[in-house]
């Protein structure tokens, strides 16, 4: 028979009492009243904060956006098909944040920073809030370094600087994405990290962009954030902020970044959908009252940081789609007023075969020549003036039949300059090549050629200079000035190439 010893029992009881943890864990919970269309109404969640993440019983995450007296309106970050009425919801005490690290370079991710390219998990130990405050006035400095796009029309007349926000605006199918992707391709070797955010696009279009980046070797310095047209509105709304958080991570590490939002019209539509389903009062074009703040808080995060913060930069190229050229609609006017200039793409120019279809007359960069190297300033001033005069004369020449010789010459020069601005897609030009192209056109060296021969001649001239006179490129890249020596080399090369070209044409 086992003897029961009282002191042993009392020791065990004493130990258990000492181990007893009196911590009380308070969980803020609620119950699903209604769910559907990506929105859930929750009863309870008394302590929930605006923008806080909430977790449903079956694992779906949502964001508490509407805090009303009787219930909480939550937008779902998923389809929410398994959420049932009456199931429980708990507040997480966190607001939306994503992991960030160098390992994201070369990957395709979604708005929650989860990889969607089938290449496994991304290791990361650091987190950043999706919504971070923009740098203040003291944290910034004015934009002064150029960010070359590789497109002559932009780099010469609508220059973009590091830390600038330049809107790309135009109708559908006018080449907006092409301008943005060419800019990314041109950052090769420039030590610029690129983030391309695709919002509400066809999956096939995003796949095409990613393939282009891979073929041209641009993926190694690029992150693609994609939420396609079949994604929930919540994720389409969050995607740009995810991209901005990733770009900021590099910016605060003294790196230069370029971010493209393609496009903000789709983000505004997703936000409108969420707001209307949450029964927020609609305003102009049925957008909610805070749609301006939606874009301003996103675009204000682009900055050129002060020397104290390491002089990193984040350049933003938001894209906005217009309906039949109407820039006075709500979203276009909002984004125009937030950004530091706009590149306007015209359907008429596109259909006339002028590509990139940039309407130089109404496009503008509010940073201006501060974002150009001296060599480009030296040759580009004349180009803008001559093109403006040509546009005026061309309209006038449609009505006048007998034009004097000077006007005819100016029209002929203008046609050749317009030809010089045409570029193939995915073929950005280095700044040295742009300078020689513009110089050749503005100084009349193309006047003797037929309009149809201009592009062929320029391609051959660029190749000739690269192989036979590499010192031209060396002078421009080292001094950033179009020196007399560089001009002499260029004149000589143009002369030699013209003679060769004329002989070739005669032989043909």
UniProtKB/Swiss-Prot annotation:
It catalyses: ATP + H2O + 4 H(+)(in) = ADP + phosphate + 5 H(+)(out). One of its GO terms (molecular function) is ATP binding. Its EC number is 7.1.2.2. Keywords: ATP synthesis, ATP-binding, CF(1), Chloroplast, Hydrogen ion transport, Ion transport, Membrane, Nucleotide-binding, Plastid, Thylakoid, Translocase, Transport. One of its GO terms (cellular component) is chloroplast thylakoid membrane. It is found in: Plastid, Chloroplast thylakoid membrane. The keyword Ribonucleoprotein does not apply. ATP binds at residues 170-177. Gene3D superfamilies: 2.40.30.20, ATP synthase alpha/beta chain, C-terminal domain (1.20.150.20), P-loop containing nucleotide triphosphate hydrolases (3.40.50.300). The record marks 363 as: Required for activity. InterPro entries: ATP_synth_asu-like_sf (IPR023366), ATP_synth_asu_C (IPR000793), ATP_synth_asu_C_sf (IPR038376), ATP_synth_F1_a_nt-bd_dom (IPR033732), ATP_synth_F1_asu (IPR005294), ATPase_a/bsu_AS (IPR020003), ATPase_F1/V1/A1_a/bsu_N (IPR004100), ATPase_F1/V1/A1_a/bsu_N_sf (IPR036121). It comes from the Eukaryota. Produces ATP from ADP in the presence of a proton gradient across the membrane. The alpha chain is a regulatory subunit. Belongs to the ATPase alpha/beta chains family. This is ATP synthase subunit alpha, chloroplastic. It comes from Helianthus annuus (Common sunflower). The gene is atpA.
């Amino acid at each position: 028979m086992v003897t029961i010893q009282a002191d042993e029992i009392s020791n065990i009881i004493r130990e258990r009492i000492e181990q007893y943890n009196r911590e009380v864990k308070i969980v803020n919970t609620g119950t699903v009243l209604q769910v559907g269309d990506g929105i859930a109404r929750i009863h309870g969640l008394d302590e929930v904060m605006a923008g806080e993440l909430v977790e449903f019983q079956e694992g779906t995450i949502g964001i508490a956006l509407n805090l009303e007296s009787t219930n909480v309106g939550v937008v779902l970050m998923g389809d929410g098909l398994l959420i049932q009425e009456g199931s429980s919801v708990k507040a997480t005490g966190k607001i939306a944040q994503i992991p960030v690290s160098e390992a994201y370079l070369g990957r395709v991710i979604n708005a929650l920073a989860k990889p969607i390219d089938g290449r496994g998990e991304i290791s990361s130990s650091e987190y950043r809030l999706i919504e971070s405050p923009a740098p203040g006035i003291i944290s910034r400095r004015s934009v002064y370094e150029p960010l070359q796009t590789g497109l002559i029309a932009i780099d010469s007349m609508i220059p973009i600087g590091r830390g600038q926000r330049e809107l790309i605006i135009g109708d559908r199918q006018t080449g907006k994405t092409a301008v943005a992707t060419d800019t990314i391709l041109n950052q090769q070797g420039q030590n610029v990290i690129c983030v391309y955010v695709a919002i509400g696009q066809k999956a096939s279009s995003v796949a095409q962009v990613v393939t282009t980046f891979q073929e041209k070797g641009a993926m190694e310095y690029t992150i693609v954030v994609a939420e396609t047209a079949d994604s929930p509105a919540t994720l389409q709304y969050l995607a740009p902020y995810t991209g901005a958080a990733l770009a900021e991570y590099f910016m605060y590490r003294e790196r230069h970044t370029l971010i493209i939002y393609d496009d903000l019209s789709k983000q505004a539509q997703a936000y409108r959908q969420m707001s209307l389903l949450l029964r927020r009062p609609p305003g102009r074009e049925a957008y909610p009252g805070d749609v301006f703040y939606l874009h301003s808080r996103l675009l204000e995060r682009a900055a050129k940081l002060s020397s104290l913060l390491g002089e990193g930069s984040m350049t933003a190229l938001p894209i906005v789609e217009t309906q039949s050229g109407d820039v006075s609609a709500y979203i276009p006017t909002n984004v125009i007023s937030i950004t530091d200039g706009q590149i306007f793409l015209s359907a008429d120019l596109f259909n006339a075969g002028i590509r990139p279809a940039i309407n130089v007359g109404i496009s503008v960069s509010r940073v201006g020549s501060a974002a150009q190297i001296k060599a480009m300033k030296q040759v580009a001033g004349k180009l803008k003036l001559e093109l403006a005069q040509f546009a005026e004369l061309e309209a006038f020449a449609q009505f006048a039949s007998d034009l004097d010789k000077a006007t005819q010459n100016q029209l002929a020069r203008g046609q050749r300059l317009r030809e010089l601005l045409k570029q193939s897609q995915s073929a950005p030009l280095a700044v040295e090549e742009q300078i020689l192209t513009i110089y050749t056109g503005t100084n009349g060296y193309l006047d003797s050629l037929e309009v149809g021969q201009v592009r062929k001649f320029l391609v051959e001239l660029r190749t000739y200079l690269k192989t036979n006179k590499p010192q031209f490129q060396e002078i421009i890249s080292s001094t950033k000035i179009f020196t007399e020596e560089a001009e002499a080399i260029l004149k000589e090369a143009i002369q030699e190439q013209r003679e060769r070209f004329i002989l070739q044409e005669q032989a043909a």
